[in-house]
Amino acid sequence: MCKVVDVKIGNRQVKVADIKRKYLENIAESAKECSLIDKIILFGSSIEDRCTEESDIDIAVFGSQPKGKALTSKQFMRFADKLSEFDDFLQSYDILYFKTGKEDDSAILAEISRGEVLYVRE
């Protein structure tokens, strides 16, 4: 188990699991280099005290392109590679992509809406 702490990531103050902090900073930094990403929301165990070292990091990525086009773009693949390579592939990620403005009322989006905004393109 872990402790949830207030952390400054980029220019945002978020509540996150202390043991995932370095990964979250890398997510925000890596997102800056992918112009397809508008916003990233962290959700799931990484914002709760039930998080463990083995927990994956759940992020919802919102972007301007349709899902199929975004996920196969070189920019987005490089973003995903930077996350995986950051700690020699020791940390796993669950990355969900949504086109900005095309969100639906699914249960997963309800959970995401309770998450912490890690990154917003300025």
List the predicted regions and their residue ranges.
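Catalytic core of pol beta-like nucleotidyltransferases
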Residues: 1-39, 47-53, 64-122
